[in-house]
Amino acid sequence: MTNDVNWQNLRNQFPTLDKINYLNTCSLGLLSNQSKNALLTYIDTWTTLGASAWYSDWLEKTNSLKVEFAKLINASADEIAIMPSVSQAIAVISSCIDLGTDDEVVTSELDFPTIAHNFKARELKGQGKVKIVKSESMEYVDTDKFISQISEKTKLVATSRVYFLSGYINDYEKILKVARINKALFFLDDYQATGQLPINVKDKDIDIMVSGGLKWLLGGSGIVYMYVKKELINQLEPSVTGWFSHKRQFEFDPHTIEFSDTAARFETGTPSISAVYPAEQGLKFINDTGVENIRHRTLHLTSLLINSLI
């Protein structure tokens, strides 16, 4: 419950809220004092240490970021990859999946279009087919209609927990069960949910999940988190890759590629350290407050708003 949370103190950490009531976190989360100070710390470290900051501070800061996100979703840090965007994440995962002419990927028209775009591009090259389930209302996709499109031909099912257009909470667990029956990978876009709705990736047996700092995780742009279930990591070999996927990237060996045994194998280039600093503070804010508390508070405020309009 929320009795032990001082919401006014938390609110005071966001200077923007001194001026306005903000209702657009679904587009961009506000900057907290902690995240602003973290950005200044990054600048000071860069100014003071130059390139040596990579080894004294920055690489460890990236690892700390993985630990914080893993804590939030009940995963291990080794199951987390740091990516620059969901588009990059889906491109890497797509490159791990061999698609024959008759193989299928199932998504919906309410899921963020970067998912369909990636596989549409492959479809144009004769690599699989994309089935995009339509919505009658543009608010939600009928779950039974969605699962009717999943078959033994399906290689990947990709959908959202919260639809970005409407905020509707999708019954993804029902979809996941049917994907599992048909031995298809399940990819959950959780960008509009993580931080405001609790999730336990182990309890739900999710294969792959992406989220990011831009919205409800209060970290700003340039950071996406990708969870890949431990049992899947070594089964997936990306062809969209980069030097940070290598087990020993600092050997700078162009002759061999030996992927990391962790989810780092799905990373590509150098992470944006300027984005890592505020993103870590955003995650700490969410973890310290507690997602269950945030959810209860959101429902309470929503109820007050609805009742005031009746």
Q: Language-model segments: which ranges?
A:
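Pyridoxal 5′-phosphate
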Residues: 1-310
